[in-house]
């Protein structure tokens, strides 16, 4: 190991690493800011421009893109022709490339970032050097991760070189690094970048033309939000003990996005390691509790809500959510949209739960809850009620289903009353509450609710009437005077009839069945109020 090229944006640990290389007699060449950092630390270093015989130009856009650099990286030591050509042109070998890239992902995490700012953080020379070194891994080491510095330096001190397995491992990490980098760029440009360009195009002022004149070529329709090639980049957060079942291997990955309230950025304060099912259920709980502005508590079991409630205080909201289904909550997950206080913690501690999620936990609440050594506590920070960034995706054999998130807000003002009886203001509030919950229940879904509390949840049934019967049976006598929400239309009036028999006072459903009139007529006969939303909420 005689010569190393170092060019890093993230300078964490680079001075110590470079000093270790210099102590081993390795010549160091470097670019721009890295050169100045190493020189300022008193480390012997030559500038790439000196080695290449060509200065940095275009405001630093061209620094290392030189044949004198890339030939020194790509030359195969065992190839006599390669070595002869290097000698002919006076090019020296480069044995180690240490590079990390401009922070594109961190830059575009800012929602206000401009297209120009994003473009300036697209690294060109760095990925080229990394790929060149990785391609020639049999002769060249490549380091893209500062966490690797100590191990690389230790091996060089011990043997004077890097073993083939080490270089192969570094090569693999390098290609993963550049693939993730390019994927992040392509993904952002295909979504937010495209939106910015489309907005600019729509904002252009059309030239004036005489009345009746040919308008000329028309602007194309807005482009699809779905790119022709979808590049996805995820970073492994942790290995999981197993998947949904013990015989399935599993891991958890993050997309690295910085905005919003999402489970991938929750901070675990206490308890056992999260499992695959824990994370899946925690995601379901968090996305549902984000629906509510008022204090709300959500209990989840197998990704379905079993108890949901809103109230003036978070302690009261949890009490109501627990009382909604005192059986199913056992071993479940609870999410709160307000910080957990001592009163709420005392109530939570009396039940066996897997996880409690909250924006934060008061010190006195932590004192209570941490007595349960296995209870996982997740803090998610102030609640951002927006959906996760990007797309909602589902893997299928040989492909990927991609859609926008079901993020439409429930707006009772826009709902259409279709029966002679209209819901009262109190019933309308409960209908809105019930529909927010119903949106997060596996289809076919029916929710019975009253006074900001679920009374019955019919989930995942193969026909709608069975979902309704389950929810109404769970509600029992409490169904009288309550409301009922359905995630999709009624194909027959049977759900209306079952609701009427149970004493339901008002119904909300999307409408859209060819038999809507039959359901409306039956509701009128039973004296029920019913409104149509026009929006279906299937969930599978």
Curated annotation (Swiss-Prot):
Signal peptide: none annotated. The keyword NAD does not apply. It catalyses: (6R)-10-formyltetrahydrofolate + 5-amino-1-(5-phospho-beta-D-ribosyl)imidazole-4-carboxamide = 5-formamido-1-(5-phospho-D-ribosyl)imidazole-4-carboxamide + (6S)-5,6,7,8-tetrahydrofolate; IMP + H2O = 5-formamido-1-(5-phospho-D-ribosyl)imidazole-4-carboxamide. The keyword Flavoprotein does not apply. It holds the Pfam family MGS. One of its GO terms (molecular function) is IMP cyclohydrolase activity. Residues 204-224 are annotated as: Disordered. Keywords: Hydrolase, Multifunctional enzyme, Purine biosynthesis, Transferase. Pathway: Purine metabolism; IMP biosynthesis via de novo pathway; 5-formamido-1-(5-phospho-D-ribosyl)imidazole-4-carboxamide from 5-amino-1-(5-phospho-D-ribosyl)imidazole-4-carboxamide (10-formyl THF route): step 1/1; Purine metabolism; IMP biosynthesis via de novo pathway; IMP from 5-formamido-1-(5-phospho-D-ribosyl)imidazole-4-carboxamide: step 1/1. Its EC number is 2.1.2.3, 3.5.4.10. GO terms for biological process: 'de novo' IMP biosynthetic process. SMART domains: AICARFT_IMPCHas, MGS. It comes from the Bacteria. One of its GO terms (cellular component) is cytosol. Residues 1-144 form the MGS-like domain. Belongs to the PurH family. The IMP cyclohydrolase activity resides in the N-terminal region. This is Bifunctional purine biosynthesis protein PurH.
């Amino acid at each position: 190991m005689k010569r190393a090229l170092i060019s890093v944006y993230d300078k964490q640990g680079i001075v110590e690493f470079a000093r270790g290389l210099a102590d081993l007699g390795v010549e160091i060449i470097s670019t721009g800011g890295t050169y100045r950092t190493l020189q300022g630390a008193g480390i012997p270093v030559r500038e790439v421009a000196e080695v290449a015989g060509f200065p940095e130009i275009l405001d630093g856009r061209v620094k290392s893109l030189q044949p004198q650099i890339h030939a020194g990286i790509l030359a195969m030591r065992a190839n006599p022709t390669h070595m002869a050509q290097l000698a002919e042109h006076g090019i020296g070998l480069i044995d180690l490339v240490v590079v990390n890239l401009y922070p594109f992902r961190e830059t575009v995490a800012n929602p206000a970032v401009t297209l120009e700012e994003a473009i300036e953080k697209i690294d060109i020379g760095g990925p080229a050097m990394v790929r060149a070194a990785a391609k020639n891994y049999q002769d060249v080491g490549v380091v893209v991760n500062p966490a690797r510095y100590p191990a690389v330096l230790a091996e060089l001190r011990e043997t004077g070189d890097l073993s083939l397995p080490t270089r192969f491992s570094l090569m693999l990490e390098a290609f993963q690094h550049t693939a993730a980098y390019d994927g992040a760029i392509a993904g952002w440009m295909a979504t937010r970048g495209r939106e910015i360009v489309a907005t600019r195009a729509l904002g252009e002022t059309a030239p004036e033309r005489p009345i009746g004149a040919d308008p000329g070529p028309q602007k194309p329709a807005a482009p699809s939000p779905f790119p022709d090639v979808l590049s996805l980049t995820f970073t492994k957060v942790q290995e999981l003990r197993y998947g949904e079942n013990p015989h399935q291997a599993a891991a958890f990955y993050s997309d690295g996005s910085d905005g919003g309230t999402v489970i991938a950025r929750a901070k675990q304060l206490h308890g056992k390691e999260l499992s695959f099912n824990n994370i899946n259920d925690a995601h379901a709980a968090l996305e549902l509790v984000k629906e509510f502005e008022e204090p709300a508590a959500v209990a989840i079991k197998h990704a379905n809500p079993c108890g949901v409630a809103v109230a003036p205080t978070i302690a009261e909201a949890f009490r109501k959510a627990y009382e909604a289904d005192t059986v199913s909550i056992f071993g479940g997950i609870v999410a709160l949209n307000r910080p957990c206080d001592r009163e709420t913690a005392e109530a939570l501690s009396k039940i066996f739960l897997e996880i409690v999620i909250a924006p934060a936990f008061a010190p006195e609440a932590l004192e209570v809850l941490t007595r349960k050594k296995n209870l996982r506590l997740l803090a998610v920070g102030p609640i951002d009620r927006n959906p996760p960034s990007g797309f909602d995706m589902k893997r299928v054999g040989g492909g990927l289903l991609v859609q926008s998130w079901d993020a439409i807000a429930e707006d009772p003002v826009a709902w259409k009353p279709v029966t002679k009886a209209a819901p009262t203001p109190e019933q309308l509030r409960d209908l809105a509450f019930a529909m927010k919950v119903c949106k997060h229940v596996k289809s076919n879904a029916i929710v019975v609710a009253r006074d900001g509390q679920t009374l019955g949840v019919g989930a995942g049934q193969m026909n709608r009437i069975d979902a309704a019967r389950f929810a109404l049976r769970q509600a029992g006598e409490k169904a009288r005077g309550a409301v009922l929400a359905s995630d999709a239309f009624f194909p027959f009036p049977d759900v209306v009839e079952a609701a009427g028999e149970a004493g339901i006072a008002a119904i909300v459903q999307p409408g859209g069945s060819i038999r809507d009139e039959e359901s409306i007529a039956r509701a009128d006969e039973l004296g029920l109020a019913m409104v149509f939303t026009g929006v279906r909420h299937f969930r599978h």
